[in-house]
Every structure is written in C-alpha cells, then in structure tokens.
C-alpha cells in the first residue's frame, strides 16, 4: 500500500493563513500598540544551562513580557545572562530568592529534572504562573503533588512538551480521535535511547557552583565534574528516570492526546530494558514496553538506541482502516492511505486545543487565565507513562495499574517506586 507524507514546510503558508493569531486585547494596549510597562508580564528564569538558555529568548517578547530576574546555581551563567539582558535584571543563585521577589508574574523552569516539582511548587505557592520543562517529575507522587498545588492556587501551568504546538501533530491526533483510520487498536511510540558511561572519579567543586543546592533533595555524592554540568545527569536515577522520560515523554504525550486518554492512563504495563552494568549512568539505554488501556488500545513503546534520526521516532496510530503517524524528528505526518493527509476536521467533530507557538501560548494564557494546551494534570499523566514503564522493566514482570488511584493494586513492591526519600532539609 502507498503512503503519504505531509511536512511542516509543505503547509507553512496554509498554516499561517489558518492559524488563530496570538492576541493581547486592545484594552490592554498602550498608544503605540504595546502593553504598558505596568501590564507587561514580569518573567523570572530558573536554570540557564543548555536547554534553559536556548528557550529563554522565546519568552522575551518585546512589549508583552519583561525579564526581571535570572537564576542558576552556576554564578558564571547568571552573570553572563544579566550582562546580556541589561542592568535592570537581577541575578540569583538560589531559586527561593527569585520566586519570593515581587514583580515576577511567571517563571520558566529549566533546571535538572529532580528540581522541576520543588521549584514549581515554590513558585506556585508564591503566586507565580509556571512554564516547566519536561519531564514533569522523577516520581509519580511528586507529579501528583504539583497537580494539587496548581489546582489549589489557580496557577497557569504549561509543560515543555512543545509538540502539542505542532499543527501537524494536532491534526494526526484529530484524525485518530475522529476515527478517520477506523477504530484505533494500536499506538506505536518510539524514541531514542541513551548510553552507558564510565566510572567518574570525584572532582573539586568549582568555586562558582553551589553544588549542595544543585543536589538539593538528591543523595549526596562527590562532584562528578563534566558528568553533571555536561548533561550526563539525565541518565542517572538520582535525578531522573533517564531518557525514557527525558525524551520519551514527547511521543507518549502525543499518544495520550490522540487516544483521548491524556487525563488518565493504561491499566497494564510490562516491559524489558537494557541497563548499564557499571559507571555513572544507571538508567535504561534501550527498552521495549507494552501497555494496555481500558478501551482496549495497545501502546507499544520502544527505543532506537540513541538514533535521533530514526524514521521510527514518533507516535503512530493504527486503526482498522489505516494509520497516521506524527513523525517526531521530521515534524511531519505520514499516513496510509495518503488521502488521510487531506483530512479536514468538520465543525461537528472533535477539535483539540490549539497552540501554534509554545512560548507565546503560555504568555497568552497568563494574561487570559485560560488553561494551557499542556496543563499540570496532562503533564503528570504523560510523565507517569514513562515512570511506570521504568518500574515494570526494573521489576521484570507485568504490572496492573490503577490510573484513578495512581497505584499498582495489591503490589507493595511496585508501589515502593512511586515515591522516594528526599535529602534533608528538603521536602515537598
């Protein structure tokens, strides 16, 4: 059978013409079409490493938002960004000082994974809205605590699963939800795996780094040099579930969206994984996981052993009359039959929440107080799929999962993985 391909490049002009514009209401605009200084969104940025530095500029929209403060445990980073942004921006090493500062309406969090929930909670409790990088949390219990806080305080929250702002991926999900592929029975999700690492000898702590604060609630270990500030921490379970969550949350999030299950989860999970035998890294390098939903849909989640360019990366929805795939690294969709690519979703059909630019969407929701396309509950549910996959692989057996109670029924061994001890004095 033939298949079709639709890329972002092919539809750029049409997408721009059809896109709902990013709008700040005229009542809030000053005489020159910009928000008055008192109405601009005051922004604080926490975590200025590779990812944090790259996304910071997306939130600096002239006349809409204004940088107030930056924060990183590396003083050299905060000094560099303060110089770049201007003297009016304050630099901090401790996030608690930033979130307590008046004049900051929203924070962008791009710290290591084990800090996502604690910093988000501090910001929400201080009355700030939050954009938090993915994955949401290293444990299910931390993710649930964040959901509860966001609801209690009425915070606007957006998760960094930016593929929800890809129009083509939204279309792929709408094609599946509206049964243009017939009855959905299987979702195939694939993402690149990670790698093993050598043993890392202790290194002197650089004077510009607050290493104790970098560790936070994680176990205290000697400073490992490049392994920590070079991103290798993403493969160590003290800080995260590994690339199964760091990268895997993207296509799993799309799978949840297209299955109509992004506020719940599967009822069974089983899998096998390949873990390093020694060295600094201890999270899965490769995996094969199968999950089953209450609606009968099977989700098969695999890795490509760190092949970022594999055409298998993404989320493929298979139905009784065809399939459609959101191809992760090409930002395109594939379909069989190809006629699916010409699908127009009618006014009486299922339409998903629309966002065409993740950063602008967050700023607009901060002003309008509308729910984002990836709120805390949705972020938590997508991240949970990564976490229970890892638990099933580590235990090496099929597990039943209760998505309502968020526990493994009558399975004390598996439930022990749902939370972890926090190094004093840190707590949620």
Which residues are covered by each model-predicted region?
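Beta-strand-loop-alpha-helix segment that lines the small-molecule cofactor/substrate pocket
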Residues: 117-165, 179
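NAD(P)-dependent dehydrogenases' Rossmann-like dinucleotide-binding region
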Residues: 47, 180-197, 210-224, 267-276, ...
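Rossmann-like dinucleotide-binding domain that binds NAD(P)(H)
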Residues: 212-295
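N-terminal Rossmann-like dinucleotide-binding module
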Residues: 14-86, 163-166, 255
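Basic phosphate/pyrophosphate-binding loop/patch that engages nucleotide-derived ligands
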Residues: 148-155, 171-186, 203-205
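C-terminal helix-rich "cap/oligomerization" subdomain common to oxidoreductases
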Residues: 13-37, 282, 365-428
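NAD(P)-dinucleotide binding in Rossmann-like oxidoreductases
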Residues: 287-356
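N-terminal secretory signal peptides and thylakoid transit peptides that target proteins
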Residues: 1-18
């Amino acid at each position: 059978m033939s298949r079709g391909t639709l890329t972002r490049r092919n539809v750029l002009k049409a997408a721009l013409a059809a896109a709902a514009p990013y709008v700040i209401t005229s009542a809030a605009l000053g005489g020159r079409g910009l928000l008055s200084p008192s109405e601009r969104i005051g922004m604080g940025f926490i975590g200025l490493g590779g990812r944090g530095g790259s996304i910071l500029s997306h939130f600096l929209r002239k006349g809409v938002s204004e940088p107030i403060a930056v924060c990183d445990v590396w003083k050299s980073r905060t000094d560099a960004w303060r110089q770049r942004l201007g003297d009016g921006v304050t630099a901090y090493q401790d996030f608690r000082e930033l979130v307590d500062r008046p004049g900051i309406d929203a924070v962008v969090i791009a710290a290591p994974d084990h800090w996502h929930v604690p910093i988000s909670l501090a910001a929400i409790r201080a009355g700030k809205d939050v954009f938090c990088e993915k994955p949401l949390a290293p444990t299910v219990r931390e993710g649930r605590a964040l959901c509860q806080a966001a609801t209690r305080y009425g915070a606007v929250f957006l998760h960094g699963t930016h593929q929800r702002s890809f129009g083509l991926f939204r279309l792929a999900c709408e094609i599946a939800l509206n049964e243009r592929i017939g009855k959905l029975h299987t979702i195939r999700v694939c993402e690149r795996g990670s790698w093993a690492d050598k043993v890392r000898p202790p290194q002197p702590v650089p004077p510009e780094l607050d290493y104790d604060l970098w560790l936070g609630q994680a176990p205290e270990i000697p400073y490992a040099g490049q392994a920590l500030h070079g991103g290798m921490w993403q493969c160590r379970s003290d800080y995260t579930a590994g690339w199964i969550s760091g990268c895997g949350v993207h296509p799993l999030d799309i799978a949840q969206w297209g299955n109509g299950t992004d506020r719940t989860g599967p009822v069974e999970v089983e899998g096998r994984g390949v873990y390093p035998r020694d060295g600094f890294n201890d999270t899965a390098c490769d995996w094969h996981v199968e999950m089953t939903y209450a609606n009968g849909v099977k989700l098969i989640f695999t890795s490509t052993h760190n092949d970022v360019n594999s055409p298998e990366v993404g989320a493929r929805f298979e139905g009784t009359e065809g399939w459609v795939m959101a191809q992760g690294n090409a930002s395109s969709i594939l379909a069989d039959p190809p006629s699916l690519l010409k699908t127009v979703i009618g006014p009486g059909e299922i339409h998903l929440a629309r966002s065409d630019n993740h950063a602008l969407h967050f700023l607009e929701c901060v002003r309008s107080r509308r729910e984002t396309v990836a709120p805390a509950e949705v972020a938590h549910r997508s991240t949970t799929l990564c976490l229970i996959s890892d638990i099933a692989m580590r235990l090496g057996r099929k597990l039943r999962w209760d998505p309502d109670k968020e526990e493994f029924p009558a399975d004390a061994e598996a439930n022990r993985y749902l939370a972890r001890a926090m190094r004093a004095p840190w707590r949620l």
